């Protein structure tokens, strides 16, 4: 799955079919995004932070250290991971469903830590850091929860 969404687009839609059992190796999804709220099949998600690793831009974690990648874990199988080339955290406002994120050292979850990502993202954006490419790669087979369709919409 490959997709390009221009930064600053009034509205952009991306629908990705995520098979309930597994997805092929090396499937890639590329998006260019701006900070905002996204709508998924399981509810509304907030974009809390990412980095364009190709240009060297980074988002700092809550400890202040730069992160060049993270892992996304399925809510029904934390042992499986997706390698992420750029930072992304999607979480519903009520925090009832989210893609957990893993740094090089520890797992992050909960509203406070995720809010810190958003704060850092806005600070970096205000400082003029170019954040224009989000790229994450699915490696290997990955089991997903019941919502096998992920619909992302720029609002």
Model region roles, listed by residue range:
Residues 1-155:
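Surface-exposed molecular-recognition determinants
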């Amino acid at each position: 799955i490959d997709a390009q969404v221009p930064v600053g687009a009034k509205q952009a839609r991306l629908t990705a079919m995520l098979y309930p059992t597994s997805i092929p190796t090396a499937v890639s999804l590329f998006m260019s995004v701006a900070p905002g709220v996204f709508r998924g099949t399981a509810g509304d998600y907030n974009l809390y932070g990412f980095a364009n690793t190709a240009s060297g831009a980074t988002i700092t974690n809550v400890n202040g250290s730069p992160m060049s990648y993270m892992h996304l874990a399925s809510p029904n199988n934390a042992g499986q991971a997706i390698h992420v080339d750029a930072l992304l955290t999607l979480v519903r406002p009520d925090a009832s469903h989210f893609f957990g994120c893993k740094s090089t050292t520890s797992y992050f979850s909960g509203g406070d830590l995720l809010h810190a990502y958003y704060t850092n993202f806005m600070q970096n954006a205000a400082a003029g850091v170019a954040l224009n490419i989000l790229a994450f790669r699915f490696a290997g087979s990955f089991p997903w929860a019941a919502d096998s369709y992920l619909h992302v919409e720029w609002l």
